[in-house]
Every structure is written in structure tokens, then in C-alpha cells.
């Protein structure tokens, strides 16, 4: 074997894109920024940083782990607190992701859609299954959904969208065990159906589109966009979304 790329942390979902003939992956970002450097990282920053990463991986690239993490707000790599005084002058030399995704959501599978059953906008786009966070306290856990990223010639052509929701079956996830199901894997059937698997009970869902594809457009996506207000999907408010202390929960 040969070294293809380096500086990659905890990749679970990896996929070859036949349209671009390139390798792509979704990366789990690091944890515990507040625990390692409480003077410079608040508990809120610990919950929303760093990004999970959607990557196009080319031969010879270095993505900076463990020396850096990706800050989705600054849209740049940042030197990790453990290495601030280790002689690393800049994080600019490291490769960037195609997109930064919400922190700690645990992207566990990646699939590029090749079928024709869904409306045309989904062709060659990326589906990502988020297993869900375990350590965003004192804020609600996040993820537990499947998202879609529209793609054009191997690059994102829009923001990520909620594609499949309802796996957790609760509105506020205090801890991982509260979620009934956790999306884990993705597969495309011969007819273009999308299959989503769960890691807790081994359940599998089949997703099909049975309406008129030619009439599908932005209006059909509005209701899905509203889902981003749910506590396990939206960015937590620093004050309003603080969870009660364990000893006050009855």
C-alpha cells in the first residue's frame, strides 16, 4: 500500500464519487475543547465546535489532525489548544473541507445518489447519515437525522438540507439514550430507493418518492427547512437552550 492522505481523524463514512472519479469522506471532529482549555473555550463553544467535515480527498493532502480543527464559523482551520505553544505558526497549510457540518453530530455514512426515482435535483447529490452526538452538554444533543447536500460536478451547490427526520422520536435529547433510533448506514436500491439503517434495534427504512417528480421544487422543501428549528438540529442558544442541572430533573 501507499500513503494516500494524512491528517484525518475518525472517518466512518467514505465513498467513491463515480461522477468525478474522486474519493470523498465525512469526518468526526474532535471533542472536549472546553475540557482541554476552559480559559479560551466556553461550554457553548464546546457544544458548537469544531465542525464535522465533508471532504474531497486527493492524493498527498494533509487535513491537519491532530494539530488543527476546522472552525465552520471562521471557515478556516484553527490550531488545536494542545498545540498552540508547540511551534506551529499557522494552520493555513492544511487542506480544507468542502463543507463544515454541525459539531458532534457523528456522520457515519455517505452516499452519492445515482438513481432516477427521486426528483432530478437529487441526482449525484450527497446523503449523510448522522448517528447523533453524545457529549454536547449542558446543551441538548444534536444530529440523529439524514441530510442531503446538492452537488454540481462534485462540489456543493447549496447548503445542507434535512432529508429524513423523526428517528429520535423526542423533541429534546438530554442524553444519547433518549433517542429511540440512531441513523447509521445508507444504501441505494436497484430501483433508486434509499435505505437507512439504525444501530440500536437494527431497523431499516426504505425511502421512495411516489409523486410527480416534475412538480418538485422549492415549495416542497419549505417544510423540511422548518425542521431546523428543532432543538437537536438548530444551533443552541447560549442561554435559552441550557439544560437544567441533573439534580433538578425529575
Question: Where do the PLM segments sit?
Answer:
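Short, solvent-exposed mixed-charge patches
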Residues: 246-250
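Conserved loop/turn motif of beta-propeller repeat scaffolds
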Residues: 20, 191-192
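Loop/turn residues immediately N-terminal
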Residues: 30, 201-202
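C-terminal amphipathic alpha-helical "assembly" element
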Residues: 186, 193-195, 204-207, 211
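Beta-propeller domain segments
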Residues: 9-10, 15-177, 181, 207-243
Amino acid at each position: 500500500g501507499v500513503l494516500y492522505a494524512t491528517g484525518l481523524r475518525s472517518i466512518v463514512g467514505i465513498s467513491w464519487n463515480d461522477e468525478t472519479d474522486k474519493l470523498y469522506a465525512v469526518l468526526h471532529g474532535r471533542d472536549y475543547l472546553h475540557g482541554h482549555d476552559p480559559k479560551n473555550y466556553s461550554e457553548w463553544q464546546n457544544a458548537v465546535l469544531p465542525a464535522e467535515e465533508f471532504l474531497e480527498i486527493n492524493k498527498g493532502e494533509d487535513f491537519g489532525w491532530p494539530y488543527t480543527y476546522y472552525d465552520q464559523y471562521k471557515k478556516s482551520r484553527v490550531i488545536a489548544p494542545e498545540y498552540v505553544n508547540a511551534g506551529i505558526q499557522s494552520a493555513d497549510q492544511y487542506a480544507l473541507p468542502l463543507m463544515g457540518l454541525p459539531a458532534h453530530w457523528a456522520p457515519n455514512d455517505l452516499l452519492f445518489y445515482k438513481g432516477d426515482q427521486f426528483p432530478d435535483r437529487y441526482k449525484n447529490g450527497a446523503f449523510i447519515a448522522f448517528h447523533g452526538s453524545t457529549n454536547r452538554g449542558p446543551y441538548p444533543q444534536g444530529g440523529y437525522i439524514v441530510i442531503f447536500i446538492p452537488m454540481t460536478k462534485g462540489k456543493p451547490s447549496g447548503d445542507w438540507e434535512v432529508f429524513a427526520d423523526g428517528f429520535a422520536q423526542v423533541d429534546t435529547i438530554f442524553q444519547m439514550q433518549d433517542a429511540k433510533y440512531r441513523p447509521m448506514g445508507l444504501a441505494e436500491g436497484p430501483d433508486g430507493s434509499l435505505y437507512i439503517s439504525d444501530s440500536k434495534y437494527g431497523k431499516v427504512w426504505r425511502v421512495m418518492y411516489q409523486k410527480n417528480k416534475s412538480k418538485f421544487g422549492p415549495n416542497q422543501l419549505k417544510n423540511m427547512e422548518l425542521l431546523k428549528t428543532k432543538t437537536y438540529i438548530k444551533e443552541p442558544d447560549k442561554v435559552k437552550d441550557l439544560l437544567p442541572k441533573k439534580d433538578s430533573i425529575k
